[in-house]
C-alpha cells in the first residue's frame, strides 16, 4: 500500500487526547511520541469541555473504569463531536461485566465515533453475537468476524478495526484484512490500547478519510511489531521497548514495501 498519513503525522504533530486506563497510559503516551504525535493524558471531568477543543483527536478507552470516568468520557466525547475531531472507542472487556456493557451502550448512544477498535470478543459483544471472552482478552468463538465488523460499522456509521492474528478493517461498505503482525503482541499488556492511540493519530490527519487512515495505521503498527520481534522468541520485555523504537524508525517506504493487505 502507499503510505499517505505517516508523514503528515510527523509534519503536523497532532495532539491526541487520551482518556485511557491506568495500565496503558504510559505505553500509549510513549508510543504516540515515538510515532510523531503528541499525547495528552487527562480524565479529569473538570477539563472535558476544554481539552478536546485544543486536541486533534480523542481516544476513549474503558480498560479501568473508576470514579467519574464514565461521565468524563461522555462529556469529552460530546465536546469532541461539537468541535468536529475524530473520536476512537476502545471497548476493553465490554463483555466482562454489566457495568462495562452499560458504559459502552451509553457511549454509543450519546457520542458519534469515527472508529471502534477492539478484539474479536469485544466487537462480538457490541454486535450481540455469541462469544466466550476471557476478561479483557479475545477468547474464542465461531462467528464470521468480517460480518461482525460490517454489522457494527453499519449500525454506528463508523469504521471498525478488529484486531487479531488477521486484522479486519471495515466501514460497512468496504472491508480489508491486514496480514502483518507478530505473536508477541498478545504477550504485552496494552499493545492493543496503543494501537487505538496510533489509529487516533492517523485519523487526526486524515481529513475525514477514516477507513484509509485506519487501514494504514493498522499496517504501520503491525509492521513495527514485526520489525521489533525479529530475533526474539519469549523476550517480551525487549519486544515492548523495541516496538517503541520501531514506531520511531518507521518510514512510508517500509509501509509500502512490507504491508500485506487483502481488499
UniProtKB/Swiss-Prot annotation:
Matching SUPFAM superfamilies: Ribokinase-like (SSF53613)
Q: Which UniProt keywords apply?
A: ATP-binding, Kinase, Magnesium, Metal-binding, Nucleotide-binding, Thiamine biosynthesis, Transferase
Per the UniProt record, which EC number(s) apply here?
2.7.1.50
| Keyword Ion transport found | no
Entry binding sites for substrate: 41, 190
Cofactor(s) needed for function: Mg(2+)
Q: Which GO terms describe its biological process?
A: thiamine biosynthetic process; thiamine diphosphate biosynthetic process
Could you tell me what reaction this enzyme catalyses? Answer: 5-(2-hydroxyethyl)-4-methylthiazole + ATP = 4-methyl-5-(2-phosphooxyethyl)-thiazole + ADP + H(+)
Whether Transferase counts among this entry's keywords is: yes
| Gene Ontology molecular function | ATP binding; hydroxyethylthiazole kinase activity; magnesium ion binding
Q: Which Pfam families match?
A: HK
* Signal peptide per UniProt: none
Pathway(s) annotated for this protein in UniProt:
Cofactor biosynthesis; thiamine diphosphate biosynthesis; 4-methyl-5-(2-phosphoethyl)-thiazole from 5-(2-hydroxyethyl)-4-methylthiazole: step 1/1
UniProt binding sites for ATP:
117, 163
Q: NCBIfam families annotated for this entry?
A: PRK09355.1, thiM
The function of this protein is: Catalyzes the phosphorylation of the hydroxyl group of 4-methyl-5-beta-hydroxyethylthiazole (THZ).
Give the record's family classification. Belongs to the Thz kinase family.
What name has this protein been given in UniProt? Answer: Hydroxyethylthiazole kinase
Organism (species) = Haemophilus influenzae (strain PittGG)
Lineage of the native species? Bacteria, Pseudomonadati, Pseudomonadota, Gammaproteobacteria, Pasteurellales
Gene that this polypeptide is encoded by: thiM
Amino acid at each position: 500500500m502507499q503510505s499517505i498519513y505517516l508523514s503528515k503525522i510527523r509534519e503536523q504533530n497532532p495532539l491526541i487526547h487520551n482518556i485511557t486506563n491506568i495500565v496503558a497510559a504510559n505505553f500509549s503516551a510513549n508510543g504516540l511520541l515515538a510515532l510523531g504525535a503528541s499525547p495528552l493524558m487527562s480524565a479529569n471531568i473538570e477539563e472535558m469541555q476544554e481539552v478536546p477543543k485544543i486536541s486533534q483527536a480523542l481516544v476513549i478507552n474503558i480498560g479501568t473504569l473508576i470514579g467519574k470516568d464514565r461521565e468524563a468520557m461522555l462529556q469529552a466525547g460530546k465536546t469532541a463531536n461539537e468541535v468536529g475531531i475524530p473520536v476512537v472507542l476502545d471497548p476493553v472487556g465490554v463483555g466482562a461485566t454489566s457495568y462495562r456493557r452499560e458504559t459502552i451502550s451509553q457511549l454509543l448512544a450519546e457520542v458519534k465515533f469515527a472508529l471502534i477498535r477492539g478484539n474479536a470478543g469485544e466487537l462480538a459483544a457490541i454486535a450481540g453475537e455469541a462469544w466466550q471472552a476471557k476478561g479483557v482478552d479475545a477468547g474464542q468463538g465461531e462467528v464470521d468476524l468480517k460480518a461482525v465488523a460490517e454489522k457494527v460499522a453499519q449500525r454506528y456509521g463508523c469504521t471498525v478495526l478488529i484486531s487479531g492474528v488477521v486484522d479486519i478493517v471495515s466501514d460497512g461498505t468496504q472491508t480489508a484484512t491486514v496480514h502483518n503482525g507478530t505473536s508477541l503482541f498478545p504477550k504485552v499488556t496494552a499493545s492493543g490500547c496503543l494501537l487505538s492511540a496510533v489509529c487516533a493519530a492517523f485519523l487526526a490527519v486524515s481529513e475525514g478519510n477514516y477507513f484509509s487512515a485506519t487501514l494504514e495505521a493498522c499496517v504501520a503498527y503491525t509492521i513495527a511489531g514485526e520489525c521489533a520481534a525479529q530475533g526474539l522468541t519469549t523476550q517480551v520485555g525487549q519486544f515492548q521497548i523495541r516496538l517503541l523504537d520501531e514506531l520511531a524508525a518507521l518510514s512510508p517506504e517500509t509501509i509500502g514495501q512490507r504491508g500485506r493487505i487483502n481488499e
